[in-house]
From Swiss-Prot:
Family matches, as PANTHER family: POLYNUCLEOTIDYL TRANSFERASE, RIBONUCLEASE H-LIKE SUPERFAMILY PROTEIN (PTHR33317:SF4)
GO function terms (MF aspect): nuclease activity
Any Gene Ontology CC annotation: cytosol
Enzyme class: hydrolase
NCBIfam families: RNAse_H_YqgF
Gene3D superfamilies from the UniProt entry: YqgF/RNase H-like domain
Entry keyword set: Cytoplasm, Hydrolase, Nuclease, Ribosome biogenesis
SMART domains, alphabetized: YqgFc
InterPro entries referenced in this protein's UniProt entry, alphabetically: RNaseH-like_sf, YqgF, YqgF/RNaseH-like_dom, YqgF/RNaseH-like_dom_sf
Protein name: Putative pre-16S rRNA nuclease
UniProt keyword Nuclease, yes or no: yes
E.C. number: 3.1.-.-
Length: 140
């Protein structure tokens, strides 16, 4: 079963995809945000092309666990996405995923320009892999 992970930001959406068995996550692409209709259409096409059956959206919580304005915006986007694609949408706590992604990219010695191009994909990969690992631990 293919699962898609999303890191939804104000300017871009990082996209990751699981392998067909749902064990590992890999970065797929970064979508430059334009407007809601275009963003949903781009994601719907990826869902169709890769046979995605579930979506996982990173939920940006504050360090104390509360939800701020960005989390509410992500939840609203996820509601629109679920209505558009008709698939289950799950949330996964994304605290510090972008920080972790940035560290990995720095250690990989990528240029600043290249890091900016892929950081959202890598963050989406962290989100999705965390979700897949949790599924595996729960035996689902």
């Amino acid at each position: 079963m293919r699962i898609m992970g999303l890191d939804v930001g104000t300017k871009t959406i990082g996209v990751a995809l699981s392998d067909p068995l749902g064990w590992t996550a890999q970065g797929l692409t970064t979508i430059r945000r334009r407007n809601l209709a275009a963003d949903l259409a781009a994601l719907k096409e990826l869902v169709r092309r890769y046979g995605v059956e579930e979506l996982v959206v990173g939920l940006p919580r504050n360090m104390n666990g509360s939800l701020g304005p960005q989390a509410e915006a992500v939840r609203a986007f996820a509601r629109h996405l679920q209505a558009e694609v008709g698939l289950p949408v799950h949330f996964f706590d994304e605290r510090l995923t972008t920080v972790a992604a940035g560290r990995v990219l720095l250690e990989a010695d990528l240029s600043r320009r290249r890091r900016r191009q892929v950081i959202d994909q890598v963050a989406a990969t962290y989100i999705l892999q965390g979700y897949l690992d949790r599924l595996g631990q729960n035996g689902v």
